[in-house]
Amino acid sequence: MKKTLLGSLILLAFATNAADPQVSTETSGKVTFFGKVVENTCKVKTDSKNMSVVLNDVGKNHLKTKKDTAMPTPFTINLENCSTTTTTNNKPVATKVGAYFYSWKNADENNEYTLKNTKSGNDAAQNVNIQLFDANGTDAIEVVGNGTTDFTHSNTNDVATQQTVNKNHISGKATINGENNVKLHYIARYYATAQAEAGKVESSVDFQIAYE
């Protein structure tokens, strides 16, 4: 009888330890992720994988006030292997392609998600960032940074649902129309975060091909 009771107690203890731990709902939560992989196979051409864009010198009087911009400078990201993909077995195929610009270090969330001037020292310009635009020169690109919240929403009644994001941050979108090569056009400008002080400006941003 004692052996049977001891065995039962051991089994009960094991079952209790094996169960999911009870965590306070006030100090815990869950994040559900949604996404999609498409059949498209665009690649960044070699000449666009590591580019430099040089903006012409500009007088500081062009950048007197916060949000002033100057010296629109075009640049292009070249893609290849973008011929139209035929869907098979109802697999998803995108009809548009663009670039997703992001930087965990340089995106300035306090200044419209422009790119911070990373040049340091006595010869660095002050209060000057770099802002990116789509090819029309009017649609500003918000570089995705740590503070970007457009991809997140709260679930109703604790049910995870896939909703349309506020902004997908796919810039310079071009239609995939059967041509192998696709060009994504953009514009860079100086951007004043306050009254500019003369000096050098330098920054960088990462990008990845994204589909819609």
UniProtKB/Swiss-Prot annotation:
GO terms for cellular component: pilus. Keywords: Disulfide bond, Fimbrium, Signal. GO terms for biological process: cell adhesion involved in single-species biofilm formation. The keyword Signal applies. It is found in: Fimbrium. Residues 1-18 form the signal peptide. Disulfide bonds join C42-C82. Its main location: other. Mediates adherence to oropharyngeal epithelial cells. Helps the airway colonization process. Belongs to the fimbrial protein family. This is Major fimbrial subunit. The gene is hifA.
